[in-house]
Amino acid sequence: MAETNSREEELLRRIQELELENEVLKKKVAEVEYDAKYPKIDENFCLDEYKRYGRQMIVPEFGSLKSQIKLKNSSILVVGAGGLGCPALLYLSAAGIGKIGIVDDDIVDISNLHRQVLHTTDSIGMFKCDSAKKYICKLNPHVIVKTYPVRLHNDNAFDIVNDYDIVLDCTDTPAIRYLINDVSVLCRKTIVSGSGLKSDGQLSILNFNNEGPCYRCFYPKPPSAESITTCSDGGVIGPCIGLLGVSMAVETIKVLTGFYTKDNFKPFLSMYTGYPQQSFRVFKMRGRSDKCSVCGSFPTVSKEAILNNEIDYVAFCGKVDSNVLTPEDRITVQQFSDIVTRQSKAPVLLDVRTKEQFQIAKLPNSINIEWDPTFKKLESLDKYLPEDFDKDTDPVFVVCRYGNDSQLATRKMKQELDFKNAKDIIGGLNKWSDIVNPKFPKY
């Protein structure tokens, strides 16, 4: 009797086990049927991301969930976290790019904040790449951000660029622009390139799918160093440069989601102007140049040449040497201050900044004639001088913002206008603010 009861208990236990196994199998079958009906494109795509990116996924041109997955599985390298890089980074991280690299060795300064929208007042003194990462991680925790607080150069460019799918050139230096182009072409990376100054800018897609034209195809030789104006010298309207950065983000999304194909992509150059009326013009560009030194039929630019520093990008692009005067032709801001204090008659002071800068802040009794490399404007200086002014003996002091243009102007005045006693003020008005009058505004 006891043996019979034991056998029945064993059968009941086994039946319960089989019923449990059956329920597990039913659940697995249901999951398989569900997955067959609603396939998982990416098991790492969570419900939060559906909500986060839903408004862009429903746009027909975007490409729905598959395009969103492409963005998540993509990586971009942004070189320069400034006026172009910040808005591009802002929108691309919000759009769901999976991995973002940021290269910038510059430090956040208060003068950056009107246009470099990832940085805040609290970021002043931080590396720009680290400041940008801090903002991005708060905006979208699904994005992986890697920072490179270094200057891109021959030795590190290949190692950095190789880790990413696409490169955004958000720099403002010709030498770096050529380096980015050459390394990206040799690494078979597409480049989204932008530039901007004052209220104007332009953008293009280079080396698309490793078949489109590159930067050297359009510009085999760099512009003269004298013709290059930086944001600090020429100025920039924040929203204008920001619009270019946002446009770069749009083009990047098009490339990464496959909107552009080998068949439909045509090389282009988009040009934007903010004043007097905003306008965007798009120009068709030619294809690859067979004579291009990096992507042509007989290239002379190679990975080995770059790594061995056989290509000097700074020398290739040139630079303006502002140190053109002897020590005898220059005085310090303190020396000029002593002259002003000591003399009853105000010295002749020529300010060679633009009229816009002159209106911001100026020293008393200064004459404003903008420095012009052609030297035409300075020829009118005579009419501003006292009638008894003697070019052979009387001093005329020349000042600018940083002490660069004033050197060039002083040299021209001595060599071509016969001002024998022209003197450059070392360090310009910025140094005046540092040493003589801290209340004199810097801008």
UniProtKB/Swiss-Prot annotation:
Cross-referenced InterPro entries: MOCS3/Uba4, Rhodanese-like_dom, Rhodanese-like_dom_sf, ThiF/MoeB/HesA, ThiF_NAD_FAD-bd, Ubiquitin-activating_enz
Positions bound to ATP: 83, 104, 111-115, 128, 172-173
Assigned EC number: 2.7.7.-, 2.8.1.-
Gene3D superfamilies: NAD(P)-binding Rossmann-like Domain, Rhodanese-like domain
Textual note on the cofactor: Binds 1 zinc ion per subunit.
Function, as annotated: Plays a central role in 2-thiolation of mcm(5)S(2)U at tRNA wobble positions of cytosolic tRNA(Lys), tRNA(Glu) and tRNA(Gln). Acts by mediating the C-terminal thiocarboxylation of sulfur carrier URM1. Its N-terminus first activates URM1 as acyl-adenylate (-COAMP), then the persulfide sulfur on the catalytic cysteine is transferred to URM1 to form thiocarboxylation (-COSH) of its C-terminus. The reaction probably involves hydrogen sulfide that is generated from the persulfide intermediate and that acts as a nucleophile towards URM1. Subsequently, a transient disulfide bond is formed.
Name by which UniProt lists this protein: Adenylyltransferase and sulfurtransferase UBA4
UniProt KW keywords: ATP-binding, Cytoplasm, Metal-binding, Multifunctional enzyme, Nucleotide-binding, Nucleotidyltransferase, Transferase, tRNA processing, Ubl conjugation pathway, Zinc
Enzyme class: transferase
Cofactor(s) required, per the database record: Zn(2+)
Pfam family, one: ThiF
One record GO biological process: tRNA wobble position uridine thiolation
Residues involved in Zn(2+) binding: 214, 217, 292, 295
